[in-house]
């Protein structure tokens, strides 16, 4: 009897002991997290957070940019919303966004680097670098892009050539249902390839197709649960399988692809006759034998080239996919565009950039596609470089800043029908009207450096396609504006019919 009672007490003590240990561990976790993430006085308000995961659980992972808006209504235009263990603040409204990106921009020039991105790029390249590295790389990239045609007739002719190839590829579909995704990707990517690599690829080139597949998959994987968890538990997840490992593998293969192109360039490189971005970068590297004093090194060459390749492909390609989808969904808009194209350009020649000023409706449609597509809903994040005071709130150094472009592009005070595709938003008395509350390329010193190129591509590609085809939904297939959330917001997979215009 005593033995039985003793065993029972021992079992009870074991259970209680485990519970006490668990409670102590949880208490310690909360206390450690509280001490680590203590906020200064006058820190922006926001929803409550949990240790490690922050406020992520408050947002719908399928549409975080939309579910965020409830907190804007509750807490105001400056609210705290921590992403995992990164202290973050969301800023809403054009006056505050302008203040951040113009008047106080020196305080917000840096980029935050998550553990995932640090593993991938280690603060190299153009997009996620900061400080001296960013200044050197951006200045060089802008100068080099201009030298190789940005804003010049030569690059416009390359876009026209690629638009011709895209039209021919779509014509080969014979009016049957097809997924436009990869043909558009190939066309857009070839423009930046001609600048960075000095050549375009044939659409059937297997290496080119694999490179685009790896990039597209990487964009989807980066927003996956395992990749987000890597930002919280990197030391554990580095040994576990999952989508994060596939992401790492994809970027390794992409870096290897760029490395091979660089090796080929070195074989016949002439510093006096640079052919493209890579040649120009190699020439810049040669000026600095001591690589410790400059960001012009092999790793930055690879990362900057990949940044140009990604930024020059993903964003414009995604916008073009939204454009064709909108044409199929809104045939009356497509008919008006075609009427304007026929009147200004006709069928006998290709569109060129000089046509844009004579085509206000087409220009308005392109801008409305960008507004409704809203492909980068939080903008590319910034980081507070020094302790900063904004709108009555204290923002400590290191805080991540997200600008709420979704609210800006769907503000009922700015847009007559904010949730509806309506090109009239960009028209006034039949003429194109610029809108201040429209920032698809951001603003300030860290605005998209390829904005001019992207605008040129969007006009020539979209106009060329609508000139030659009428896009329709396949029979018995319903299209919608449903989206897929990844690094960008893209349409869900769909098919279209491109009917040649006679």
UniProtKB/Swiss-Prot annotation:
Pfam family, any one: p450
Tissue expression notes: Abundantly expressed in heart and liver.
UniProt cofactor(s): heme
Residues that, per the record, bind heme: 448
Protein origin, superkingdom: Eukaryota
Name recorded for this polypeptide: Cytochrome P450 2J3
Gene that encodes it: Cyp2j3
Organismal lineage: Eukaryota, Metazoa, Chordata, Craniata, Vertebrata
Organism, scientific name: Rattus norvegicus
Record-level GO cellular component terms: cytoplasm; endoplasmic reticulum membrane; intracellular membrane-bounded organelle
């Amino acid at each position: 009897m005593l033995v039985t009672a003793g065993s029972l007490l021992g079992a009870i003590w074991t259970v209680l002991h485990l519970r006490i240990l668990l409670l102590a561990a949880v208490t310690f976790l909360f206390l450690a997290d509280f001490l680590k993430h203590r906020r200064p006085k006058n820190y922006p308000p926001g929803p409550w957070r949990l240790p490690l995961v922050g406020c992520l659980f408050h947002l719908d992972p399928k549409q975080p940019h939309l579910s965020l808006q409830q907190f804007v209504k509750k807490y105001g235009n400056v609210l705290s919303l921590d992403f995992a263990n990164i202290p973050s603040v969301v800023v809403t409204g054009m006056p505050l966004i302008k203040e951040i990106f113009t008047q106080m921009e020196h305080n917000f020039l840096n980029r935050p680097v998550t553990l995932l991105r640090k593993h991938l790029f280690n603060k190299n390249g153009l997009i996620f670098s900061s400080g001296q590295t960013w200044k050197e790389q951006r200045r060089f990239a802008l100068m080099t892009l201009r030298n190789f045609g940005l804003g010049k007739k030569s690059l416009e002719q390359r876009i026209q050539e690629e638009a011709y190839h895209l039209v021919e590829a779509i014509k080969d579909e014979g009016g049957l249902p097809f997924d436009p995704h990869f043909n558009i990707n190939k066309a857009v990517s070839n423009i930046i390839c001609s600048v960075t690599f000095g050549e375009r690829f044939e659409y059937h080139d297997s290496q080119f197709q694999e490179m685009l597949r790896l990039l597209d998959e990487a964009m989807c994987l980066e927003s996956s649960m395992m990749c987000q968890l890597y930002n919280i538990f990197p030391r554990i997840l580095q040994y576990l399988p999952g989508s994060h490992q596939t992401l790492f593998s994809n970027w390794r293969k992409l870096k290897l692809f760029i490395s091979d192109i660089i090796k080929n360039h070195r074989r016949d490189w002439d510093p006096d006759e640079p052919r493209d971005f890579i040649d120009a970068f190699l020439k810049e590297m040669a000026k600095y034998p001591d690589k410790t004093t400059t960001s012009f090194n092999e790793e930055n060459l690879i990362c900057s080239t990949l940044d140009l390749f990604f930024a020059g492909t993903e964003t414009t390609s995604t916008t073009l996919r939204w454009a064709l989808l909108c044409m199929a969904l809104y045939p009356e808009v497509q008919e008006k565009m075609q009427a304007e194209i026929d009147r200004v350009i006709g069928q006998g020649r290709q569109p060129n950039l000089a046509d844009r000023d004579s085509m206000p409706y087409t220009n308005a449609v392109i801008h409305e596609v960008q507004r409704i597509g809203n492909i980068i809903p939080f903008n590319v994040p910034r980081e507070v470089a020094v302790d900063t005071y904004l709108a009555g709130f204290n923002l400590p150094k290191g805080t991540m800043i997200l600008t709420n472009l979704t609210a800006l592009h769907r503000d009922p005070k700015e847009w007559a029908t904010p949730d509806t595709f309506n090109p009239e938003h960009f028209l006034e008395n039949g003429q194109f009207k610029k809108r201040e509350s429209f920032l698809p390329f951001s603003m300030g010193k860290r605005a998209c450096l390829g904005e001019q190129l992207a605008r040129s591509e969007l006009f020539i590609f979209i106009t060329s396609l609508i000139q030659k085809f009428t896009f329709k939904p396949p029979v018995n297939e319903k299209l919608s504006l449903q989206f897929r959330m990844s690094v960008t917001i893209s349409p869900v997979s769909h098919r279209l019919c491109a009917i040649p215009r006679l």
